[in-house]
């Protein structure tokens, strides 16, 4: 009887240890693509390419609608493994194409990491602020917020950053 209890206890301890190791082994490095929806229900495509080093993340983001709007920004952030959440902030835009003289906005995203089968997701909220003064807007002024939905993918709609090369599949070109 005691041997059975001890075997059961050690089996349970082993399962808990394996589950805990898998949780702590989570790595966000890769390409995450989806969209963000503003408070006024405008939909934009959104892709981030990130590299995780410990709890720190860095990389680039792409916000795009069509040929009318496209922006690329550098980003930094932190991933809390125990809470399975991430805070990611765009630092500055490095490429920008916009119609008119609208001001560019940089985003701050708060994500929750979820896994369902083999699929991985980052979902959460964002706030944004104007990056520069101009056209009636002040640097740091409120650009609005909304919701963000991303799924980890193996290909990019854009140039794959050097820090991700050999870690993901290249963009597939039509034949």
Where are these regions (language model features)?
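Central antiparallel beta-sheet cores of small beta-barrel/beta-sandwich binding domains
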Residues: 26-174
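Bacterial Sec-dependent N-terminal signal peptides
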Residues: 1-29
């Amino acid at each position: 009887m005691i041997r059975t209890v001890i075997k059961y206890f050690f089996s349970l301890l082993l399962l808990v240890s394996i589950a805990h190791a898998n949780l702590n082994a989570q790595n966000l490095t890769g390409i995450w693509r989806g969209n963000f929806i503003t408070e006024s229900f405008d939909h934009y495509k959104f892709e981030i390419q990130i590299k995780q080093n410990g709890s720190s993340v860095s990389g680039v983001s792409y916000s795009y609608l069509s040929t009318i709007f496209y922006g690329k920004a550098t980003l930094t952030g932190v991933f809390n493994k125990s809470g399975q959440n991430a805070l990611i902030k765009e630092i500055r835009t490095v490429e920008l194409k916009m119609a008119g003289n609208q001001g560019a906005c940089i985003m701050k995203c708060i994500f929750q990491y979820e896994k369902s089968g083999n699929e991985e997701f980052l979902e959460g909220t964002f706030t944004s602020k104007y990056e520069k003064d101009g056209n009636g807007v002040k640097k740091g002024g409120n650009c609005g917020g909304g919701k963000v939905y991303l799924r980890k993918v193996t290909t990019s709609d854009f140039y794959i950053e050097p820090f991700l090369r050999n870690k993901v599949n290249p963009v597939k070109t039509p034949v």
